[in-house]
């Protein structure tokens, strides 16, 4: 009989000549990949362990399985190279039977995450961790066994097709891939059949009458099919009977009923562990996502662990699965995109949670839309349909991609990543973008694959503004976005970027080096930011009330604004036990509360309550703002001379002035240069240039400078210059 031996212990890790014992999962970038500076180690390290030859009967095979080695792996056994794998997120296997010696064997895995031009990803806003960060298993199988393919493909493939929704009739095709067997016995839901093996495959078809459907969060029911060989070898596989449809006007449809996909994206790493996470950590992530009420996850930007896909199957989350073909097309990387897509599909085919295969993410951010790029996407699209005719393809497009681009015609459904109201522009430009797209292409399905605003929960403000990294502005941002999305059910899927803060070692902003802080939950999973509860109010069926601002204790304003999120229809607010006001409404409740000292503020809704403590302060708490924004309260040296230009004037009008325009252009050009590829793409895109010009019509010079990340002293200095330039009368 076959057996699986876990090989996670007994490894020696070697980096630059230094040895240390490690247990898998392991990454060498758990610290330096999260601390900023963009200087984390990218190179080749090795993992070595002794491997005792297992007891093998005649015809038995020994197969090593690696579930995740980042980014390139070379496997050597007793000095002989037995395998090489390019891609850091998928499973690969190697048959080592003929390379094994009696007794002890030396297994060395060389792992490389260095910069190159052939293996994706190479350019993106997240850390490319190196290491063996998922399980390693030795499979010992008899001569007749279920196939353990090198590309990690499932040995039993299940294709359910709901042929009659009204009757809940589901036709289930089961294919078993075997070696050395003549037939396979299949069992499903009390039905049994036997099928002969032809060219390594046995195939059977079952019909389930009145099937129990896999119905998302409401009832994620899973069937189990069992395949058995005559020698007793058995393989069990879970699957779900469900029907996915995507309609340009109705959005996502599950089993015949509208089911708008509203949820989050997830990166797999976490503080202190990097990508070397445990199943318990995955379960914690899932519990947080479910608490918020999300019904979909975009598993970005690569293949995630099988254990997490299993959780999604069990809990009823609908999944967008994708490969790390991201940001920048590489001429020498075409083959790698196809390999990673093949592995993604053949390894995850049976998961009922997966609805779409993602071809790429923001691939035009640093690449031109040329024939080579288009051909690569066509090849990926064709491969996905060949390997899986049952699921549509999609891609996440960067905001500056024109909606008339030919690349949008390749996948079955599309989606856009937009950051209006954070990186650029105003919040209502998100509304305008999708309304324009939907009006121009009413027969195309469109989704919202990324949107978000960074928030450091230490930063708070009574006057939140774009670019201040406050938890308060993140709430303002998401309040607009949540309502905008709720008003547009034809958006087939929307995914907040991101559920959790994650490592991006090149970042140095918002008071935390090395982190992207757009998460609704902190990197260590310890703090649910206030915006988490906004989406809970929109999505969750579990009644609750949440008072925002628990970390905004010291307040200088005489009358403070208190925001409350709840999915209940009525909220009452109390100060020190006395009723302030009762409001009816939905999701967001705003109260104005006079404060004079230390107060307890409590929101009550039904049987639920939430309390925060506030303190009337005479001076702003400097810990509530970034150091370059602590003097923002007064940008001016004195009263403004209205006959001269100032940072309070309209940006478009100022740019049009012969004297002021060149001064501002020099500043905006400098800011654009600092943003590199993205800014260059905007400059070369007429549609985005026009969009920016429209944004300037509504922005002040001050607003544009803050958006560009200018510090307080620079803005004050510019205001002094502008106050010396008279306006033409």
Task: Mark where each language-model region is.
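Secreted/periplasmic carbohydrate-active enzymes, especially glycoside hydrolases
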Residues: 1-301, 316-319, 340-343, 350-356, ...
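Long, contiguous interaction/targeting segments characteristic
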Residues: 63, 69-143, 463-537, 667, ...
């Amino acid at each position: 009989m076959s057996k699986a031996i876990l090989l996670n212990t007994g490894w020696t890790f070697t980096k630059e000549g230094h040895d240390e014992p490690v247990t898998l999962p392991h990454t060498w970038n758990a610290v330096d990949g999260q601390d900023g500076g963009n200087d984390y180690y990218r190179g080749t390290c090795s993992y070595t362990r002794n491997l005792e030859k297992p007891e093998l009967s005649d015809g038995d095979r020994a197969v090593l399985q690696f579930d995740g080695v980042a980014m390139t792996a070379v496997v050597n056994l007793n000095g002989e190279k037995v395998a090489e794998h390019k891609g850091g997120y998928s499973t690969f296997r190697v048959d080592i039977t003929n390379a094994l010696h009696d007794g002890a064997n030396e297994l060395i895995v060389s792992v490389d995450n260095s910069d190159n031009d052939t293996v994706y990803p190479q350019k993106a806003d997240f850390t490319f961790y190196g290491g063996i960060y998922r399980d390693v298993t030795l499979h010992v199988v008899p001569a007749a066994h279920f196939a353990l393919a090198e590309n990690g493909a499932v040995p039993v493939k299940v294709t359910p097709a709901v042929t009659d929704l009204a009757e809940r009739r589901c036709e289930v095709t089961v294919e078993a891939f075997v070696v050395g067997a003549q037939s396979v016995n299949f069992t499903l839901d009390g039905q049994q059949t036997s099928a002969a093996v032809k060219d390594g495959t046995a195939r059977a078809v079952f019909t389930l009458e009145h099937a129990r459907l896999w119905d998302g969060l409401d009832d994620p029911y899973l069937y189990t099919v069992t395949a058995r060989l005559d020698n007793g070898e058995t393989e069990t596989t879970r699957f779900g009977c469900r029907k996915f449809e995507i309609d340009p006007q109705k959005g996502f449809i599950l089993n015949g009923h509208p089911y708008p996909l509203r949820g989050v994206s997830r990166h797999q790493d976490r503080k202190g562990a990097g990508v070397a996470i445990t199943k318990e950590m995955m379960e914690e992530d899932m519990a947080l996502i479910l608490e918020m009420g999300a019904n979909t996850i975009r598993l970005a930007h690569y293949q995630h662990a099988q254990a997490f896909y299993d959780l999604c199957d069990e809990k009823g989350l609908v999944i967008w699965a994708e490969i790390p073909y991201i940001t920048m097309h590489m001429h020498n990387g075409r083959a790698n995109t196809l390999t990673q897509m093949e592995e993604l599909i053949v390894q995850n085919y049976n998961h009922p949670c997966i609805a779409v295969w993602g071809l790429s993410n923001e691939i035009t951010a640093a690449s031109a839309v040329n024939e080579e790029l288009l051909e690569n996407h066509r090849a990926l699209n064709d491969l996905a349909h060949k390997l899986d005719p049952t699921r549509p393809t999609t891609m996440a497009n960067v905001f500056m991609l024109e909606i008339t681009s030919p690349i949008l015609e390749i996948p079955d459904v599309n989606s856009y990543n937009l950051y209006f109201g954070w990186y650029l522009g105003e919040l209502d430009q998100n509304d305008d973008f999708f309304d324009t797209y939907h009006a121009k292409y009413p027969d195309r399905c469109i989704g919202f694959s990324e949107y978000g605003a960074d928030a450091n929960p230490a930063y708070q403000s009574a006057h939140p503004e774009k670019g201040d990294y406050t938890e308060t502005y993140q709430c303002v941002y998401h309040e607009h976005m949540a309502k905008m999305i709720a008003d547009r059910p034809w958006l087939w899927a929307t995914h907040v970027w991101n559920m959790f803060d994650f490592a991006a070692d090149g970042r140095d902003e918002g008071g935390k080096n090395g982190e992207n802080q757009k998460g609704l939950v902190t990197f260590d999973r310890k703090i649910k930011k206030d915006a988490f509860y906004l989406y809970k109010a929109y999505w969750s069926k579990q009644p609750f009330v949440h008072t925002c601002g628990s970390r905004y204790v010291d307040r200088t304003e005489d009358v403070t604004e208190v925001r409350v999120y709840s999915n209940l229809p009525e909220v009452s607010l109390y100060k020190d036990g006395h009723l302030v006001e009762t409001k009816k409404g939905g999701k967001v409740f705003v109260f104005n509360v006079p404060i004079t000292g230390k107060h307890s503020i409590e929101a009550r809704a039904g049987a639920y309550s939430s309390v925060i403590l506030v303190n009337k302060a005479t001076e702003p708490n400097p810990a509530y703002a970034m150091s370059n924004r602590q003097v923002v309260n007064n940008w001016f040296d004195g009263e403004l001379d209205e006959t001269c230009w100032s940072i309070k004037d309209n940006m478009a009008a100022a740019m049009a002035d012969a004297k002021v325009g060149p001064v501002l252009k020099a500043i905006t050009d400098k800011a654009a240069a600092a943003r590199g590829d993205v800014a260059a793409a905007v400059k070369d895109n007429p549609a985005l240039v026009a969009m920016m010009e429209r944004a300037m019509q509504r922005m002040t010079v001050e607003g544009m400078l803050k958006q560009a990340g200018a510090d307080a002293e620079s803005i004050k200095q510019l205001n002094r210059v502008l106050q010396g330039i008279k306006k033409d009368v």
